[in-house]
């Protein structure tokens, strides 16, 4: 069974973070990919509207929740 919050039938969900001029990364969206290399390529192509200084992707399944809504 696929956990729809972490995966889709097309692949894993990756969260995309980037920064332009500010010192901290900001969440800018998400992509779906079958592996890390595709996730990087999809993020770079999909979110190319700025000249980002830094961009990173992380599998949603790798995010550890500290405080969650009840």
Describe the predicted segments one by one.
Residues 1-3, 41-42:
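Glycine-rich, charged/polar anion/phosphate-binding loops
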Residues 2, 47-70:
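Short, mixed-charge low-complexity intrinsically disordered segments
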Residues 4-26:
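Short aromatic-glycine-(Arg/Gly/Cys) micro-motifs in beta-strand/loop hairpins
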Residues 25-34:
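A short, exposed loop/beta-hairpin motif centered on an aromatic-Gly-Thr core
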Residues 26, 41, 65-67:
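Short acidic, gly/pro-rich beta-turn/loop elements at beta-sheet edges
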Residues 34-52:
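A short, charged, amphipathic alpha-helix used as a generic interaction element across diverse proteins
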